[in-house]
Amino acid sequence: MAFIYYLTHIHLDFGAVSLLKSECERIGIRRPLLVTDKGVVAAGVAQRAIDAMQGLQVAVFDETPSNPTEAMVRKAAAQYREAGCDGLVAVGGGSSIDLAKGIAILATHEGELTTYATIEGGSARITDKAAPLIAVPTTSGTGSEVARGAIIILDDGRKLGFHSWHLLPKSAVCDPELTLGLPAGLTAATGMDAIAHCIETFLAPAFNPPADGIALDGLERGWGHIERATRDGQDRDARLNMMSASMQGAMAFQKGLGCVHSLSHPLGGLKIDGRTGLHHGTLNAVVMPAVLRFNADAPTVVRDDRYARLRRAMHLPDGADIAQAVHDMTVRLGLPTGLRQMGVTEDMFDKVIAGALVDHCHKTNPKEASAADYRRMLEQSM
């Protein structure tokens, strides 16, 4: 059986942010570095977290980019050490939480960040010295608040994963109230990320019934509420269910992901118009139909009737084309439906394919993908 580890403290409810101080005290954090971004600060959400930690010595790092980078990890880790911090509180989307995980490594371990990347054999080098982290998500997508991994763009342009149980947040404070002001476009993109996690981890071939059950329930919640949350950001029930779907997708994906993510990781590391950082959730939505078509005849998918089980969770008719349903949902949400719309060109394929073949998600796809397979998926996603 696959290794199963669900030991994060999770608080999921409206008003949960008020528990921040008591959670810090439980964990032993007295001087937290609050890791966030300018948008969360401007929305007043960061201040709500600071107010909830009244009496603690809170330092603030608010320069998280749209995709976390090694350079920003270095800068924040230096602030962590200079301020004498003893823990981290990440308030934001997956970028802030992943950046905080990078800080948790670099502020407490020697050497360059790249030596701790999963594909460099770095997981074993991450020890229990890693700084303790509390995660407060303000989007519903990555589920990084309950995950042991982080995705960070390195100085050399590679977008790599860092995985260790020592990076698992000590507490996930999931307050849907913090997502009520999230713009429609970001609600849709992050929501499709959560849906991708639930679908892809369910299709991963490892034997892990608890993960499968969590993923299917998360998919039903996400698929059933993403349009409502996008249409009406103040819909509290939809926001609660999307936050749960996000959390559940990440709880389950310890089972493994697949080609959606092995493609979206290198795609997210591309420089488009001189800038790095295509949105991860949007990329997942765009490439997912091609990957679903590729995986349809995978042995474990056929043996376990997994597409029929996905249809039931998504409330689709028997025999419905799941790939087309995902594409149609992306259209209804107003997201880009092709990589070309996002600035990707065919001359970038070789770099993306090279990254996909060594990505940590490549090995857990239900069907082995070759370079030619990845090229076809990219062509179909343009």
Swiss-Prot record:
Binding, NAD(+): D37, N67, G94, S95, S96, I97, D98, T138, T139, S140, G141, T142, K159, H280
Keywords for this protein: Iron, Metal-binding, NAD, Nucleotide-binding, Oxidoreductase
Residues that coordinate or bind Fe cation: D193, H197, H261, H280
Keyword Iron: yes
Gene3D superfamilies named among the record's database cross-references: 3.40.50.1970, Dehydroquinate synthase-like - alpha domain (1.20.1090.10)
UniProt xrefs under PROSITE patterns: ADH_IRON_1 (PS00913)
Reactions accelerated catalytically: 4-hydroxybutanoate + NAD(+) = succinate semialdehyde + NADH + H(+)
Domain of life according to the entry: Bacteria
Coiled coil start-end: none
Regulation: Shows competitive inhibition of GHBDH activity by the product succinic semialdehyde, and non-competitive inhibitions by the three other substrate-product combinations. The conversion of GHB to SSA is activated by two different saturating purified nudix hydrolases, B.methanolicus activator ACT and E.coli NudF. The nudix hydrolases do not activate the reverse reaction.
Role this protein plays: Involved in the degradation of 4-hydroxybutyrate. Catalyzes the interconversion of gamma-hydroxybutyrate (GHB) and succinic semialdehyde (SSA).
Name recorded for this polypeptide: 4-hydroxybutyrate dehydrogenase
Originating organism: Cupriavidus necator
